[in-house]
Amino acid sequence: MYDLVVDVRARLGQYVGPFDVSNVRVLGYGHLGDGNLHLNVSSPDGYHAELEKIIEPFVYQWTADRRGSISAEHGVGAMKPGELRHSKDEASIEAMRRIKDVFDPRGILNPYKVLPPRKAGPGSKL
């Protein structure tokens, strides 16, 4: 699991572009009991969209290739519900929606922040 940290560091080492990655730190920490790894990537210069563009798609693909999940005990949050499709198929996401519908039938608890929106199509509820 910690191989992700090593592989992200290697990915940064291959980067050629306008953003200086020489001082970027990549650390992993998590929960051994349930196999969660939190990836912390930081730059002394603060947040850079370029750094996110270098790393984020790589991490999603790396995780999908190993049949992992990009979410764990904290969920995917408000900014990335659509990214759940990297590690869960549509049937699994629909099962999650149905469970949520049981406990939140009016959709008032964190609307659009937990699961990606339903794809429009025959028989879909939007």
Locations of the language-model features?
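Conserved glycine-rich FAD pyrophosphate-binding loop
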Residues: M1-L126
